[in-house]
């Protein structure tokens, strides 16, 4: 990994305690998108990995995964697949339910957007407990995809999400 980029990210990303609720340490990634240089470096780093590993599609988890995933897809001339929250996509969809701290949620993609031949890189801003990431991989697997990997900006390693995901999928992060 790019140590200079990691150091720059660690300096720039603001941590907001108790937002949006008590006990959460919110990682504010707008300091990345506010900086042309830092945003470009992040997109370039993910793009380099994506190109090297010959992914055919880039998926992004709603909402902040859209920011980085779509930029990577654009840079490489690849299709971008939005992984949306329940009720946000018209037409034929594939869905996956997953557990939240209090209850259940669901994510969806268009059924026609991915085929079994695709190699999909899932991009998001961070991984915490791994629940949403795991659901995203299961969702894409339902379409027969064999190569699925993750690239996150931030790994909140103390919440063990990356450890959970790495049992089944390759996962990379910038910090």
List each language-model region with its residue ranges.
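Structural motif
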Residues: 56-57, 119-121
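PRPP-dependent phosphoribosyltransferase catalytic core
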Residues: 19, 134-175
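Conserved G/P- and acidic residue-centered "switch" motifs that form tight phosphate/ATP-binding loops
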Residues: 125, 130
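Short, glycine/charge-rich flexible loops or terminal/linker lids adjacent to PRPP-binding catalytic cores
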Residues: 81-120
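Short Gly/Thr/Asp-enriched flexible loops that form oxyanion-binding sites at enzyme active sites
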Residues: 67-76
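Active-site-facing substrate-recognition patch
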Residues: 1-55
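Short, hinge-like loop/turn segments at secondary-structure boundaries
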Residues: 76-77, 97-101, 166-169
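Short glycine-rich phosphate-binding loop at a beta-alpha junction
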Residues: 54-62
């Amino acid at each position: 990994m790019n140590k200079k980029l990691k150091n720059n990210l660690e300096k720039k990303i603001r941590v907001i305690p108790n937002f949006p609720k008590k006990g959460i340490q919110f990682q504010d990634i707008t300091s990345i998108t506010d900086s042309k240089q830092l945003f470009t470096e992040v997109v370039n780093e993910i793009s380099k990995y994506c190109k090297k590993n010959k992914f055919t599609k880039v998926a992004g988890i709603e909402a902040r995964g859209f920011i980085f995933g779509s930029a990577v897809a654009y840079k490489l001339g690849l299709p971008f697949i939005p992984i949306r929250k329940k009720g946000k996509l018209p037409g034929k969809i594939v869905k996956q339910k997953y557990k939240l701290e209090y209850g259940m949620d669901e994510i969806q993609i268009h059924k026609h957007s991915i085929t079994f031949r695709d190699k999909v890189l899932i991009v998001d801003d961070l991984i915490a407990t791994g629940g949403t990431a795991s659901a995203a991989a299961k969702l894409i697997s339902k379409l027969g995809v064999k190569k699925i990997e993750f690239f996150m900006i931030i790994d909140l390693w103390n919440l063990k999400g990356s450890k959970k995901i790495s049992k089944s999928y390759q996962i990379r992060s910038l910090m």
